[in-house]
Amino acid sequence: MADSDDEYDRKRRDKFRGERSDSYRTERRDERRPISSSGGARDEWNPFRGSSAAGGGGGGGARHRPDYSDYRSPGGGGPRARYGSPGREMPPAKRMRPDWPDEGMRSNPRFGGYDPYMMQAWNEHYQSLHYSHGGGHMPIARETSGPGIGNDTQTQPAMLTLKQFLDTQDENISDSEVMRKYTEYKTDFKRQQLNEFFVAHKDEEWFKNKYHPEDSVRRSDEQRGFLQRRSSVFVELLENGTIGSVKVDSSQADPLVRVLDMCVIKLEGGTDEDLKILDEKPKEPLVFERKIEPIQTTAALAAATATPKSPKKNENDNGVAVVVSPQKNDLKPVNSDEENWETDKKSDENDKNDNEQGDGDKKGGESSKKQLKKKKKTKKRKRKSSDDDDDESSSSDSESSSSSEEEEDEEELKKKYDVEDGLRTEQKAEQEKDKKEEEAIKAANVEEQPKAEEVQEKIEDEKEKVEEEPKPDVKTEAEAVAEPDAEPKKEEEEKAKEPEDEEKKPETEETSKMETENGESKEETKPTPEPAVESAPAADVIEMETETIDLDKVKDGPQPRALHRTASIFLRNLAPSITKAEIEAICNRSPGYLRVAIADPLVERRWYRRGWITFSRDVNIKEICWSLNNQRLRDCELGAIVNRDLSRRVRPTNGITAHKQVVRSDIKLCAKIAMNLDERFRLWVDEPAPAADGKGETATDATNGSSSGATTYGFNTKNPVLQNITDYLIEEASAEEEELLGLSGDQNDVEGEPIVRDEQLIAVLDRLLLYLRIVHSVDYYNHCEYPYEDEMPNRCGIIHARGPAPMKVTSNDIQEYIKSYEGKLQQFLTKTVLLTDDDIKDLGAKDAETEVEKFVQANTQELAKDKWLCPLSGKKFKGPEFIRKHIFNKHEEKVDEVRKEVQFFNNYLRDPKRPQLPEHPGTTKRPEFEPSRGAGGYRPAMYPPFGGLPYGFAPPMPMGGRGGGRGYQARRELPLEHQRRVIGYHDLDAPANSDRENAF
């Protein structure tokens, strides 16, 4: 269905109006003609007569109907732009924001004011090759936003082909001269691109860390320090047998993870005490959740442990939840306190009702009351065995019974009930004095907390002693107070409680007397079953108290630190102008900040970088992430998100790696990689560089199997992993036996052979694999290196191990696997050789003295005869030689900066893997399509070679459309075999002679 708006506009256009006949609705045409008009309707027809654009603003004319298009224009005046459907004028759908800003190619202060060298970097030498387009240069903004620039990747500008370059030269030039000039042009073009890239990025931190003469040395020393620290940790683990006890197999994921975590803890400065945290993994979630509890819960725990004068008061008041909650709800450590507080209150109310009934029965008679007490005790024991509710009822029991008669009855009952009754008497006596001691407790709350912990530790020791003794002999617990072994502990407890509470000592003595009486009465009666059951609640009370104190000790006391567990934040957008110090300044405001890592920029991301900020595990990482998202650094959004923990730290690889032949090949490759990396960072060697080069040569000879290299391969290095490595590099085979018996491997090649594991070779390989992974951050089975791992949140986070082995494997598969793996590891096997001085001269290397001379000449200005000015200081001199002397004496730091700048640029040129913009796709594909161009050719006058679309993928067509005209045609992109061939004419009447065939 056609669009109604477009149909309406089509009918209103002047193009169709003029083609209609005069007899076609003349009356309607008269209505549209202005009253004051005397000419034809076509001459004075104005499509915008309803708007202010009509001549004279419409004054003096009749009132006409406003144009329908005026109501649909975005600005309210004038017609809608005539392209597309009016539905496209609706607000555009919100698209997802990418990981980096879209305006990175433009100068926008929102993203740090970073403006990559779009058009300002072209040299004046190439400006002469720019040609005008329609009276001026092509509009850069429109061209850069075209479809060819939809990709985020920046590229170099397209380089002229030989044919295009020939069009710029004189017609009488010779072929040799053309080739010479074209070679010079390509060399100058490459120099220009390198120079522009250096100028654009020389002030950025990542670029300085690579090539600046001072910053690069500082960075390399820092990395070497990291490697030396890692190597020392590896040697320590190798000597104590930790490395040798683990195999790099996916089936041993847990031991591998443990070894990696041990390395991380050691790298973080941990001790052997901190390594114990690896055995306490189930306790980590509880400790972490307790630290993020609300403030009220933490205050309740602190109040429960900071009242040593009345430790049982917490059981009767709000402290009951603190004691019982860890035991009742072990599966919900976070919400256990809040949930149990409500249940404890309900149980307290029920126990008070039971106590009232007990008081009424007591008046009936003493004997009946004792029977009821026994029934209540039995009922409470049953509840204790199910869900520990008798502790709550016993505590509320003692709270309700406060009369003196009940105290006497309790003393008589304690002759039959041993431990629990003594504790109840102690609780009752303490509750009577709680009100008097409350003010003193609040005043000495902070000072008494450490003493309370000491007391509870001694109570815990007593509890352990009681648990070791047999349960039927519960009377020994009461008699233990009088024994010499228990007397010092009791005296220490009383001494610790004396400064806290003066009345605590009489209570202890009274309790000991009661326990002694209970012991004497127990010798007479000996109710063996009942005291055995009664002792359980008392021990549980002590155990619950100890657990509550332990929760606080985990937080406050010296405990193993989980240094291998961290929390981190990922920064998606970091402009190249942002430095690491600026990020550290922001992160230092947050608690628990450890380090920050910034990745190298990528051309695909328009040189924006990514970052990882590491914090300790016990911080509120989401709150810190929220605060970072609310901050802007140099008007750049950081894009902070919470970084998840690693999901799978041990990942399997092909199981064929366990085969003996593959293992032997892997040992060779690992040894080569280890020696190359050790030589690059000068590890394990104290000799100068030539000795290291000689060592590398011997390593190569040993790998090839030469006898001379084999004797010196392992002994030329102090690396303990590479010593005596040549014993495992020589292959063995039963060649003579197979020849005599006439055996051949053809049958095995067809059917395959089973995987053969050589445990001795695998042990040697595993040491090399762990050395590369721990020291050099190289994951061999993943054939990659994890860069800047010492600054990342997870050090030694991921490792690839041998997976399950297949049943059989052919020799062809083994050879293909070894060959492909060696190709993937070429980046580590080949040494990085810097370019020589002769090589960098062709790339535009600079000379320090020449640049200093240029600097002096640039700062020597002649004002008049015998009057010269130095712009650096503003002083005037009589001659240029005085200015030269002045610059070298007074501005020596400026001269040094010039020399450093020259060395900076030359270091960039020496790197064979230097970063630079990728070549233009048109430049790389040009040789394939160049012969297919027609005679029409390409005229640079129609298209500026560098101006219009410097970073596009497809060259724009200058004049014509997609078909004819000069320029690049559509089928130019097709290969030769897919293009149309020239249709020739063949005369059928001509004789069958190929020489006379004429093709037109």
UniProtKB/Swiss-Prot annotation:
<dbReference type="GO" id="GO:0016604">
    <property type="term" value="C:nuclear body"/>
</dbReference>
<feature type="compositionally biased region" description="Basic and acidic residues">
    <location>
        <begin position="412"/>
        <end position="441"/>
    </location>
</feature>
<keyword id="KW-0943">RNA-mediated gene silencing</keyword>
<dbReference type="GO" id="GO:0031053">
    <property type="term" value="P:primary miRNA processing"/>
</dbReference>
<comment type="function">
    <text>Acts as a mediator between the cap-binding complex (CBC) and RNA-mediated gene silencing (RNAi). Involved in innate immunity via the short interfering RNAs (siRNAs) processing machinery by restricting the viral RNA production. Also involved microRNA (miRNA)-mediated silencing by contributing to the stability and delivery of primary miRNA transcripts to the primary miRNA processing complex containing drosha and pasha.</text>
</comment>
<feature type="region of interest" description="Disordered">
    <location>
        <begin position="691"/>
        <end position="713"/>
    </location>
</feature>
<dbReference type="Pfam" id="PF12066">
    <property type="entry name" value="SERRATE_Ars2_N"/>
</dbReference>
<feature type="region of interest" description="Disordered">
    <location>
        <begin position="1"/>
        <end position="104"/>
    </location>
</feature>
<dbReference type="InterPro" id="IPR007042">
    <property type="entry name" value="SERRATE/Ars2_C"/>
</dbReference>
<dbReference type="GO" id="GO:0035194">
    <property type="term" value="P:regulatory ncRNA-mediated post-transcriptional gene silencing"/>
</dbReference>
<dbReference type="InterPro" id="IPR021933">
    <property type="entry name" value="SERRATE/Ars2_N"/>
</dbReference>
<feature type="region of interest" description="Disordered">
    <location>
        <begin position="911"/>
        <end position="940"/>
    </location>
</feature>
<keyword id="KW-0597">Phosphoprotein</keyword>
<feature type="compositionally biased region" description="Basic and acidic residues">
    <location>
        <begin position="486"/>
        <end position="527"/>
    </location>
</feature>
<feature type="compositionally biased region" description="Basic and acidic residues">
    <location>
        <begin position="448"/>
        <end position="478"/>
    </location>
</feature>
<feature type="modified residue" description="Phosphoserine">
    <location>
        <position position="336"/>
    </location>
</feature>
<feature type="modified residue" description="Phosphotyrosine">
    <location>
        <position position="83"/>
    </location>
</feature>
<dbReference type="GO" id="GO:0050829">
    <property type="term" value="P:defense response to Gram-negative bacterium"/>
</dbReference>
<feature type="region of interest" description="Disordered">
    <location>
        <begin position="302"/>
        <end position="539"/>
    </location>
</feature>
<comment type="similarity">
    <text>Belongs to the ARS2 family.</text>
</comment>
<feature type="compositionally biased region" description="Polar residues">
    <location>
        <begin position="700"/>
        <end position="713"/>
    </location>
</feature>
<protein>
    <recommendedName>
        <fullName>Serrate RNA effector molecule homolog</fullName>
    </recommendedName>
</protein>
<dbReference type="GO" id="GO:0030422">
    <property type="term" value="P:siRNA processing"/>
</dbReference>
<feature type="compositionally biased region" description="Basic and acidic residues">
    <location>
        <begin position="8"/>
        <end position="34"/>
    </location>
</feature>
<dbReference type="GO" id="GO:0005654">
    <property type="term" value="C:nucleoplasm"/>
</dbReference>
<feature type="modified residue" description="Phosphoserine">
    <location>
        <position position="85"/>
    </location>
</feature>
<comment type="subunit">
    <text>Interacts with cbp20, Dcr-2 and pasha.</text>
</comment>
<dbReference type="GO" id="GO:0045071">
    <property type="term" value="P:negative regulation of viral genome replication"/>
</dbReference>
<dbReference type="InterPro" id="IPR039727">
    <property type="entry name" value="SE/Ars2"/>
</dbReference>
<feature type="compositionally biased region" description="Basic and acidic residues">
    <location>
        <begin position="342"/>
        <end position="369"/>
    </location>
</feature>
<keyword id="KW-0539">Nucleus</keyword>
<dbReference type="Pfam" id="PF04959">
    <property type="entry name" value="ARS2"/>
</dbReference>
<feature type="compositionally biased region" description="Basic residues">
    <location>
        <begin position="370"/>
        <end position="384"/>
    </location>
</feature>
